[in-house]
């Protein structure tokens, strides 16, 4: 189920653009440079997300990246919802997520979108967002593999939407889950081979 269309096309395009610009801010790279940790593209996997920031050895930098990457997804949703409507909020959230994954500033080579996904789900439907966060946390604690935790949280999101009374977010969450699965295709191959590194490993 999708939200009813209640916003004009020009406003939808505007909020989609705002969402994309918010999402495309590469906080992981900004923070690692601000902390004097070097160029994130030359560290670990070269990814701009929280897991790779953690490979610098700075838990503070990783926590800041997690909060800001999640925050930009939430901000896009909350701003669009407050000033336009639910349809604009979902579009802004989607574009914030895609902005993180494909930022124009980095030649469309960004992160895998997990923190931004969790942030925008918390803003769209907080019970679903909390359930997704707990899913991620549970798998991460039990298996110590960040990518597996992310995949489980993403795949569970549409189910949580239906179980927790947020069917209007189910289609969007399913679309985001598909993108996350695709962005993690190399991780999936390593998981199948048993070579995926655990959290904290470089």
Swiss-Prot record:
A single MF term (Gene Ontology): acyl-phosphate glycerol-3-phosphate acyltransferase activity
Location in or out of the cell: Cell inner membrane
Keyword Transcription regulation: no
An example Gene Ontology CC term for this record: plasma membrane
Annotated keywords: Cell inner membrane, Cell membrane, Lipid biosynthesis, Lipid metabolism, Membrane, Phospholipid biosynthesis, Phospholipid metabolism, Plasmid, Transferase, Transmembrane, Transmembrane helix
Pathway per the UniProt entry: Lipid metabolism; phospholipid metabolism
Catalytic activity: an acyl phosphate + sn-glycerol 3-phosphate = a 1-acyl-sn-glycero-3-phosphate + phosphate
Stretches that traverse the bilayer: 11-31, 60-80, 88-108, 117-137, 162-182
Keyword Lipid metabolism listed: yes
Function of the molecule: Catalyzes the transfer of an acyl group from acyl-phosphate (acyl-PO(4)) to glycerol-3-phosphate (G3P) to form lysophosphatidic acid (LPA). This enzyme utilizes acyl-phosphate as fatty acyl donor, but not acyl-CoA or acyl-ACP.
Oligomeric form and interacting partners: Probably interacts with PlsX.
Official protein name in the record: Glycerol-3-phosphate acyltransferase
Organism: Ruegeria sp. (strain TM1040) (Silicibacter sp.)
Species lineage: Bacteria, Pseudomonadati, Pseudomonadota, Alphaproteobacteria, Rhodobacterales
Gene: plsY
